């Protein structure tokens, strides 16, 4: 008969300083299906090392070990995990149940890694617990169970995937005599059902219940009686549970890892919250700076647009401050007409200005009088609280009419409800008030100078007696490039004048400069916020490293029941990502509260959250979890099952 487990000249040595200590010395052993074998020996004899090699938790230094004819030396880590999952069931002296899982959930764990669907897992776990007399303890946690009950849960877990070979390491060592007898009775029942049962013990009474007792001393087998053929043995076991397809196994494993991650977070609420705090602050900082910074930028740009955007101002001279008399009369009315005919011009308004005295009854104030066209107010985004602007007839007839700003109206007519139609003196010229213009409130503040506007024809002909213009403001049509329009305007006037005796000021260039400046500032602040997010990520990595250390035994248990390294990696990586995602969601909520609070104190600001900003925030959370969770998850996946199980 072919042995189920076959060991030939197995040796296992461990480094001890500069030397190698040999624990197993040429072990040769055959174990047949359906046997109940006891391996006995004193502490340090090598029996636990032999059990680890039998259960594929450890590899021999040399020699050959075959399971059902398969040489385990040819298998990689994932194949060994599959072998443990499908052929072996472990029963440990200290039970090794996961404390945060119920009895039922502990029994389900091996089937999770086999890819069995949840409904089937649940039914099989309940069936096994019922068979072992624990049907009324399925929802109990390990701390709520007695030692004997915990060991029965451990046995049920060993049988979850079939348990063709049951490896029991001191199964009664931590139990009282009555519970120990119950456990041994269960092992006998399993033997009768066709399971191969291997008991590692130093208790002679337990060993005596086995059909064959193998004694090991100082790493060598000193007693190995031949296997006894059983007349009624069937040589089989209950069928192994059917594993699901690769896709279902992946989905089941992912869902279980997600569930386990959530349970781990819930089990340490305060630590989880403190871990999330760095992510919450980081995400809230990034989102708030992006959103509030964008609102501030739009506010600044709106103020600049209120001054007049997409406009080009033309002034006489070489540059600001140039008062050379030869350039003062450079701009003429003919230039204005020529500019208005250009296809890229939406409107062109001249400006003639002079500081004059305004008088009404006994009120006498200084003001800046500006001669403009009717388009001037549209160009600069001004509205009228009373009356209206000049019409073409008033421009052509040099009408003695005037538009006041709100400050001038308040100074001249503090108690009048309606000032349209009133007559004031502008310099020495009487003028009828036809409107009151309201300038947009700007975060840059308002000028202290009182301002009035007259038709440019009136200002130049009746007030100043000059035939030239102080400036021309050109509004470029939508769709035309402002910089190109500025170049064409410069060429036009240079050809007309025969020289360049003027200069231009493009407000669109100012707008672009401000946009660039605000973007740079916003980027700088975002980078500062990202630093806080990185600090939060480092905090997550630190806590996850601590978590891996604390849960080393749990990792060993999972590997013993069939978890692959990739399963462990996935679980801890998902846990890190989940911490960051929940922290990210709370961070976004905090940034919303910050934004709404700011809006209460800054009603003029339009603070809005774009879906892209929220998506980027969640993306940042996910990337942070992956980046800073990778190292702890990798460390967990690289743990040796034997070392992990030995940790306290």
From Swiss-Prot:
GO biological-process terms attached to the record: response to antibiotic
CDD domains cross-referenced by the UniProt entry: ABC_MJ0796_LolCDE_FtsE (cd03255)
Main localization of the protein described in the UniProt heading: membrane
Pfam families, sorted: ABC_tran, FtsX, MacB_PCD
SUPFAM superfamilies referenced in this protein's UniProt entry, alphabetically: P-loop containing nucleoside triphosphate hydrolases (SSF52540)
EC number(s) given by UniProt: 7.6.2.-
PROSITE patterns, A to Z: ABC_TRANSPORTER_1 (PS00211), ABC_TRANSPORTER_2 (PS50893), MACB (PS51267)
Residues that coordinate or bind ATP: 41-48
Oligomeric and partner information: Homodimer. Part of the tripartite efflux system MacAB-TolC, which is composed of an inner membrane transporter, MacB, a periplasmic membrane fusion protein, MacA, and an outer membrane component, TolC. The complex forms a large protein conduit and can translocate molecules across both the inner and outer membranes. Interacts with MacA.
Official protein name in the record: Macrolide export ATP-binding/permease protein MacB 1
Organism name: Escherichia coli O1:K1 / APEC
